[in-house]
Structure formats: structure tokens, C-alpha cells
Amino acid sequence: MFNNKLIILVGRSGSGKSAIESKLTKHGFEKIISHTSREIRDDDLVGESYHFVNKEFFENEINSGNFLEHAIYNGNYYGIHKMSIKEGINYVVTVNPSGFKSLTKLFPNNISFYIKVNEKTMLLRALNREECPDCKTICQRFLNDEIEFNNIENEVDYVIFNNDNIDKAVNKILQST
């Protein structure tokens, strides 16, 4: 177990959780950089968005017990490596619902937020963040999210709406911490 303060952001694809996470780093929270086996997107920064690794590396580290939490989403691994956490630092992290459940057990000093956004805004964000969006992939992510995020609003501490004003959403999170 860790005594670090942790803000956990959970939200569907296109909800703006990564943009909120980025803004929270300007307010004294350090981003936990997760590992993933997914392909790099146009707007990704290696070592800042994620640590990009292959599936073999990921599976070996899982088998060695080196991930605090991990999940498979759309056929790709995502997880937080033990080496990513240092004692005494306050963190912010974006995760899926299974990651949220794992982290709440490891970090009892956490505050969790579901980042909610209307579907039109979500879709436009997803389409605009990639240079050549693959509509089939985006639709699959949305369908998967429909199932995966079912009932998450009842499990988190707060629900934050992020339809049009990210600074307003960030301020609500900061007021709640």
C-alpha cells in the first residue's frame, strides 16, 4: 500500500481525461506514466503519453509481478509499473474501470472522478485527435466503452462534466481535493 495522495480520473475515450490530467500537473500533481502495448497515435509523446512497449515485454513484466495494475483494452495491454511510483509524491492518473478498482485498493488516500461528456463531444474529440481517423476503430472503442463504463458513476467519489470548459472541470476537481 502507498500513502501518496492520488487523483484517479476515469472516463470514456474522448472524454478529455488526458487533457484534464495534463492541467492538473500544473497544480502540484505528477502524472503517472502508464505502459501500453498499443500503437502510437499522432498526438502521443513517447515517455509522456505512455511508455510504449511490445506485448512480449508487457507479458514478461506481468509474470514477474512488476505491474501494480494492468488491463487489456481493445486487444492492447495498459498498466502501471511498480517503478513508476515514488513515496511522498502526489499523483494523478487516468485509468479504465478495472484500473480504478485496483488502484483504490493500493492507494487508500485517493479521490476518484468520472469524467463525463456528451456523446457528440466525445465523438468529435476522438475524430479530431488523429490525423487520419479510423472510424471503425473509433466506433469499436465507443461500443466497448458502453459496456466497460456501465455503472462506474456509482463507484467513483465525484462525477465531473467536461463538455465545453476544461478549466471549469479542472477547478471542480481541485476544489474536491
What feature does the model see in each segment?
Residues K17-S18:
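Walker A/P-loop
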Residues L9:
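Hydrophobic anchor at the beta1->P-loop junction of P-loop NTPases
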Residues V92-N96, L106-L127:
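Conserved phosphate-donor/acceptor-positioning beta-strand/loop module used by diverse small-molecule
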Residues K26-S34:
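Post-Walker A helix-loop "phosphate-sensing" segment adjacent to the P-loop in P-loop NTPases
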Residues R12:
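P-loop (Walker A) phosphate-binding loop of NTP-binding proteins
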Residues M1-N4:
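Phosphate-binding P-loop
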Residues T36-Y91:
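ATP-dependent small-molecule kinase phosphotransfer cores
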